[in-house]
Every structure is written in structure tokens, then in C-alpha cells.
Amino acid sequence: MVIFGLTGGIGSGKSLVASYFKTLFKAVVFDADQVVCQLYNCDNSVIKLVKTYFPDSVDHGVVNKNSLRQHFFAYSNLWVEFQSTLHSIILEKQKNFIMFHNRQSTKYVVLDVPLLIESNFYSCCNFIIHVTTNRLLQMQRVLYRGLSIREFESIIAIQLSENDRKKFANFTIRTGLSKGDVLFQIQKIMFDISHRSKYLSC
């Protein structure tokens, strides 16, 4: 089994790249954002965790994500502590996901994790792919999601720089051009690794 980790800033196109891996090469994708959403919606221990740190963000047992988002943008020491605990839960989910698909003899796993490098989610990766685009397109994608320019800049400020991500990456994919160009870059990566030695997951 080969494990790819995607690293890139918000709006860089990581989910797009992950979807192409899934479609073209039948890769399974660990979507950390989706996992977090499920935890907030259904996991009582996580809901309790949110209530412990931010009681104003839980109403009748339901996490108010808009309220919680404001705590994220405040980025206090309390948030950092909460985030560290939450990340340990997500990391355990990721490990279980990888072990399950290893038993299923899955060929390719893609980790779509926003803070792959920053939170040490990359240790099981055989290859790290740096996903990047130009800043204008990156900002347009984020604004389309409903975030403000100020929120976009706040997120960028806490993420690794492009240069730091490159230091960890084996490959780079640029998503600012056409879909066909992105597909070509992915196919080139797959051709490259197919001529290397076999890799084992952790």
C-alpha cells in the first residue's frame, strides 16, 4: 500500500487533487475535514470536549460551528490546547483508517489533512505532495466558501509557508491551470512511483 499525504494552504486545491486520485486510481481518501464534521455532529465525547473548553459553543447537546469558528479565529491558548486534544483524536481515526485499508489490500491511500505537516499527520506517508496555486485564485476559492478576506489571512498566518511545505514534499502539483493539466501532473507522479521500489505503510 502506498500512502500519499497532501499538504497545501487553504484553497490550494487539495480536495480536487484527492478526488482525482480517487477517480483515476481508485485511491481511498481520508478527509480530515469530513471526520471533524462527523465528530462534532455525532461523537458525544467530542461534543463534551467542546463544551468543556467553549461552553458557549454547545447548545442543547449540539455544537454551534459558527460560534466555535470565532474561537478558532481568536486562536487563544485555550484554543491551541483544545485543538491539540482534538488532533490526537483525529490522528487515531487516521491510524485506524490506514490499518483497515491495509488489511483490505487497498493499493493507494490519500490523506487530505489541512495541517498535515503542522500537526504531524504525515509520519505514515510514503510520499508527500505539495499542492499549490496562485494567491489570487486561492483567495477566490476561500471567499466562495463564505469566508472573509480577514478570515482567509488569519488562516494563512497560522499555516506553514509555501517554502516550508516544499522542504517536506516529494512532488508538487499546481492547480491554477486547467483540470487536464492537474490530471497530467498526477499521472506523471504515478508513473514516477511505479518505477520505484515497493513501499510499505507504517
UniProtKB/Swiss-Prot annotation:
InterPro entries associated with the record: Depp_CoAkinase (IPR001977), P-loop_NTPase (IPR027417)
Pathway the protein acts in: Cofactor biosynthesis; coenzyme A biosynthesis; CoA from (R)-pantothenate: step 5/5
One Gene Ontology CC term in the entry: cytoplasm
Gene Ontology biological-process entries: coenzyme A biosynthetic process
CDD domains: DPCK (cd02022)
Reactions it catalyzes: 3'-dephospho-CoA + ATP = ADP + CoA + H(+)
Compartmental location: Cytoplasm
Primary enzyme class: transferase
Gene3D superfamilies: P-loop containing nucleotide triphosphate hydrolases (3.40.50.300)
Domain of life: Bacteria
Sample GO molecular function, one term: dephospho-CoA kinase activity
HAMAP family linked to this entry: Dephospho_CoA_kinase
Stated family: Belongs to the CoaE family.
Family matches, as NCBIfam families: dephospho-CoA kinase
Function: Catalyzes the phosphorylation of the 3'-hydroxyl group of dephosphocoenzyme A to form coenzyme A.
Entry protein name: Dephospho-CoA kinase
